[in-house]
Design a protein with these regions (language model features):
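Short alpha-helical donor nucleotide-sugar binding micro-motif in glycosyltransferases
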Residues: 222-227
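Aromatic "clamp/platform" in nucleotide-sugar-dependent glycosyltransferases that forms part
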Residues: 235
Length: 326
């Protein structure tokens, strides 16, 4: 069976492409003939028209839109096309005409058109169903997979506890983490570009930190291995991949007691109210002072990531493709 994966135009943000680069080889092993096809055109009126014609000429037995270019679904066969929706954050971040365009061409019309939709979490599915109750029967939840290999590492004890923050956008809620740790003997490693306000807070409160931007996958993995705690009290996630990356790296995890992060983390994290700095602080102190508890939490994380292997996720997509062909 041929499966063509339709990707957005390549850009600096490669999170979707990275995810499917782990899943697709496992789908190949299940006997599928796969191709990855990237959109060569820009997102403007002429570019969209060219994109539609381009992808219509690349149709296979199964066409899988991997995300972002949701509008393409409107112009493809509804029975042989599946769309993966990662989140609906555009509905909360956009306003006016942009929000109207996003709703109709990224949400309503693609979902109305297709028979098959996947989401990466129950939360994203729930958000869609709240907007479009009639779409529930179309949606299958297939989670993201872990995108680097777990490996046993010899952790070298640090004189100062190393706390990792991954992502600096508003939804990552890193200011609450800053407030929670400002009086603790810790050092932060922050992955992502900091704005002026964030930098000022760190410097005004004499918080020890390192800032890493534009790093490679190998560098990111090394940062995880050198960290003691991932602090991830996010306010909104489509999934929450850093949780799994930390668990695979034997890093203790603190994350939000909201969906989908609490489901993704399983039993391998301390769940906190993301807006309660004192709760976050107490959780960090617990991990700093109770080595046995920390070890138990890390072991639970290593068990949890077994549910998110590329092989497991590929099998779920295979089951969906077979259903589409009936």
């Amino acid at each position: 069976m041929e499966v063509n994966f339709f990707n957005r135009k390549l850009s600096k943000s490669l999170s979707i492409e990275k995810l499917f680069s782990f899943i697709i080889p496992e789908i190949d092993k299940l006997g599928y003939d796969t191709k990855i096809i990237n959109n060569p055109y820009d997102l403007n009126i002429l570019g969209v028209i060219k994109s539609i014609l381009f992808f219509r000429s690349k149709k296979a037995t199964i066409n899988h839109i991997t995300g972002d270019i949701h509008w393409l679904a409107i112009f493809l066969n509804p029975k042989s096309t599946v769309l993966t929706i990662h989140d609906l954050v555009g509905l909360t971040q956009l306003s006016g005409l942009k929000r109207w365009i996003f709703y109709w061409f990224w949400v309503y019309l693609p979902i109305k058109r297709l028979n098959y939709i996947t989401t990466i979490s129950e939360k994203t599915k729930k958000e869609i169903v709240e907007l479009l109750p009639w779409a529930e029967h179309k949606i299958t939840v297939i989670e993201n997979c872990l995108t680097f290999s777990a490996k046993k590492v010899e952790k070298i004890p640090h004189e100062i506890t190393q706390i990792l923050i991954v992502g600096t956008r508003v939804n990552k809620n890193i200011e609450t983490t800053f407030s929670a740790i400002k009086d603790l003997p810790v050092e932060l490693t922050i992955v992502g570009e900091l704005n002026r306000k964030q930098l000022k807070y760190l410097k005004d409160h004499n918080i020890r930190f390192k800032n890493k931007i534009n790093i490679s996958e190998e560098e990111l993995q090394q940062i995880y291995f050198e960290s003691d705690i991932l602090c991830f009290p996010s306010l909104y996630e489509g999934f929450g991949l850093p949780i799994l990356e930390a668990q695979a790296s034997e890093v203790a995890v603190i994350t939000s007691n909201i969906s989908p992060t609490k489901e993704v983390a399983g039993k391998g994290a301390i769940l906190v109210n993301p807006l309660d700095k004192n709760e976050i602080k107490k959780s960090i102190e617990l991990l700093m002072n109770d080595a046995e508890f920390k070890k138990s939490l890390i072991n639970s994380g290593l068990e949890n990531i077994k549910n998110y292997s590329p092989q497991m996720i590929a099998k779920k997509y295979s089951e969906l493709y077979k259903k589409m062909m009936k």
